Amino acid sequence: MQLLDGKATAATIREELRAEIAALTPRARRAPGLAVILVGEDPASQVYVRNKERACHDTGIVSEAFRLAPTTTQEELERLIADLNVRPDIDGILLQLPLPRGLDAQRCLEAIDPAKDVDGFHPQNMGRLALGLPGFRPCTPAGVMTLLERYDLSPSGRKAVVVGRSNIVGKPLALMLGAPGKYANATVTVCHSGTPDLAAECRTADFLFLAIGRPRFVTADMVREGAVVVDVGINRTETGLAGDCDFEGVSRVASAITPVPGGVGPMTIAQLLVNTVQSWKVRCGL
């Protein structure tokens, strides 16, 4: 069984980006800039934002965090986004979700300039993904695809099953897996709460992707011998973080598997950095 170490892979990507930023900054005359907006006091969101800030600092990206009160209004939030859209030193804007009740997250995401939408959630970027056109890809599924490529695990011509259909992971991941390319080109099935026999569908997968937010839900008897299992789930339990699969059991039948934590999570942040650097290069004409 091969452990797909997202933490180590993400560290390698940060090293590559650090070298690229150092080489290009003299021509750009500034470092890449990322604005992170956090509204409210959700503990998990605060941890995620700190991790992103740390990764930016480690890579050479200037990270500017805007920590707003939970009483922030829709108008105030959209005004901040509008200001960041026109700031020349900001290459990417990330709105940390979820937002407090009363705020319309979709409206806020649509207010972000698509050219600075490094999270890849603007309808324009999602539409470009669906059409196979260049654009920012959502960070978690793009990080998953990068992890497969770095480990030379190609789903091309194979059966891929995605469990979960969220706009953040399931839908875009299915589109990426089914797109042309050496590390894509899979035959994709998307499963969800309406799937009659989920276990049977999972057992057909050469590549199984889990993104349902249910701790240890997928067990070894639901996984084909030799399958590659990518667990996107991050669930807080009484005993700590757990993925969507029973790692101990599934790792005995899988040929490769991501751990939780240390699998997809670090790759999500790495992809955010990649997107930010890409925006910086375009905006600076590099």
From Swiss-Prot:
Keywords: Amino-acid biosynthesis, Histidine biosynthesis, Hydrolase, Methionine biosynthesis, Multifunctional enzyme, NADP, One-carbon metabolism, Oxidoreductase, Purine biosynthesis. It holds the Pfam family THF_DHG_CYH_C. The keyword Amino-acid biosynthesis applies. Its EC number is 1.5.1.5, 3.5.4.9. GO terms for cellular component: cytosol. GO terms for biological process: L-histidine biosynthetic process; methionine biosynthetic process; purine nucleotide biosynthetic process; tetrahydrofolate interconversion. Pathway: One-carbon metabolism; tetrahydrofolate interconversion. One of its GO terms (molecular function) is methylenetetrahydrofolate dehydrogenase (NADP+) activity. NADP(+) binds at residues 164-166, 193, 234. It catalyses: (6R)-5,10-methylene-5,6,7,8-tetrahydrofolate + NADP(+) = (6R)-5,10-methenyltetrahydrofolate + NADPH; (6R)-5,10-methenyltetrahydrofolate + H2O = (6R)-10-formyltetrahydrofolate + H(+). InterPro entries: Aminoacid_DH-like_N_sf (IPR046346), NAD(P)-bd_dom_sf (IPR036291), THF_DH/CycHdrlase (IPR000672), THF_DH/CycHdrlase_cat_dom (IPR020630), THF_DH/CycHdrlase_CS (IPR020867), THF_DH/CycHdrlase_NAD-bd_dom (IPR020631). Gene3D superfamilies: Leucine Dehydrogenase, chain A, domain 1, NAD(P)-binding Rossmann-like Domain. CDD domains: NAD_bind_m-THF_DH_Cyclohyd. SUPFAM superfamilies: Aminoacid dehydrogenase-like, N-terminal domain (SSF53223), NAD(P)-binding Rossmann-fold domains (SSF51735). Homodimer. Catalyzes the oxidation of 5,10-methylenetetrahydrofolate to 5,10-methenyltetrahydrofolate and then the hydrolysis of 5,10-methenyltetrahydrofolate to 10-formyltetrahydrofolate. Belongs to the tetrahydrofolate dehydrogenase/cyclohydrolase family. NCBIfam families: PRK10792.1, PRK14184.1, PRK14186.1. This is Bifunctional protein FolD. It comes from Nitratidesulfovibrio vulgaris (strain ATCC 29579 / DSM 644 / CCUG 34227 / NCIMB 8303 / VKM B-1760 / Hildenborough) (Desulfovibrio vulgaris). The lineage of its organism: Bacteria, Pseudomonadati, Thermodesulfobacteriota, Desulfovibrionia, Desulfovibrionales. The gene is folD.
